[in-house]
Amino acid sequence: MYQKDLYDLQIDLVFKCNDFSNLSNHFINKSDNIIFESGFWEEVLLCWIKIILDEKDTSFPNFILYKKSFSLSLQIINDNEISSINQKWMNKSGSTDVLSFPIISDEDTTKDLNFIELGDLFISLETAFKQSLEFNHSIKKEMLWLASHGLLHLLGWEHNDDYELDNMLNFQEYLISKLD
């Protein structure tokens, strides 16, 4: 995992995971069960935020680069729940793999200089599992892929065209590679 000094960075993670014991007992390797643990996600998200701050990437609002404490929620839910959220908040029918609801805006520059509330991130474990089979990799890797995508959106990264999407996907690969 990315070993640079995390200096004074802190993350306040509100983590919720539905009971997927029937799925995890039958379809998920025991080594991948770490995706159900809050501590795993705290470490991963803090690592990624540190990398982003070190990179000083211009795809993020400048005020992000000077924060020391980040707060967000991550919820691992099922297809029915994400479909309901997708319909209610995005006005789209059907399930999806990840939804992010950023809170940040340019006005955040006037708030506490060290703390920022990023928003809410929802990942459908059922869709992630299907995609892990489709792409022939572990559920852990798929969950990392989806979490990195959602985090980048929470930090203000958008993909309005293929070029921006390619840049975002490449940066996701970079973030995930730093966890090895």
From Swiss-Prot:
GO cellular component assignments: cytoplasm
Record InterPro entries: MetalPrtase_cat_dom_sf_prd (IPR023091), YbeY (IPR002036), YbeY_CS (IPR020549)
Domain of life, per lineage: Bacteria
Localization: Cytoplasm
Protein name according to UniProt: Endoribonuclease YbeY
Function description: Single strand-specific metallo-endoribonuclease involved in late-stage 70S ribosome quality control and in maturation of the 3' terminus of the 16S rRNA.
PROSITE patterns linked to this entry: UPF0054
NCBIfam families: rRNA maturation RNase YbeY
